[in-house]
């Protein structure tokens, strides 16, 4: 875990919303509303529907999260 109290879960982007918000279906089946982190925004990493992402969630609100990593669609050679 990066920060104390946060936990990370892998998910699949199922819908793209305005203002860099996304609906993500987590591994456990829950659907959350997630925004992209500052490092992803600063490095112009594009996230599209169908991408596998890593989300950070806080125990206070399990319906919202932050996308911290987009997994590669093809493995590196």
Curated annotation (Swiss-Prot):
It comes from Nephroselmis olivacea (Green alga). GO terms for cellular component: chloroplast; cytosol. GO terms for molecular function: ribosome binding; rRNA binding; translation initiation factor activity. One of the essential components for the initiation of protein synthesis. Stabilizes the binding of IF-2 and IF-3 on the 30S subunit to which N-formylmethionyl-tRNA(fMet) subsequently binds. Helps modulate mRNA selection, yielding the 30S pre-initiation complex (PIC). Upon addition of the 50S ribosomal subunit IF-1, IF-2 and IF-3 are released leaving the mature 70S translation initiation complex. Signal peptide: none annotated. Keywords: Chloroplast, Initiation factor, Plastid, Protein biosynthesis, RNA-binding, rRNA-binding. Gene3D superfamilies: Nucleic acid-binding proteins. SUPFAM superfamilies: Nucleic acid-binding proteins. Belongs to the IF-1 family. This is Translation initiation factor IF-1, chloroplastic. InterPro entries: NA-bd_OB-fold (IPR012340), RNA-binding_domain_S1_IF1 (IPR006196), S1_domain (IPR003029), TIF_IF1 (IPR004368). SMART domains: S1. Pfam families: eIF-1a.
């Amino acid at each position: 875990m990066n920060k104390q109290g946060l936990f990370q879960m892998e998910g699949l982007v199922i819908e793209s919303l305005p203002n860099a918000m996304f609906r993500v279906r987590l591994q456990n089946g829950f659907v959350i509303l997630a925004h992209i982190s500052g490092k992803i925004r600063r490095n112009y990493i594009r996230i599209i529907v169908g991408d596998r992402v890593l989300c950070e969630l806080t125990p206070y609100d399990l319906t919202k999260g932050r996308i911290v990593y987009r997994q590669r669609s093809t493995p590196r050679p």
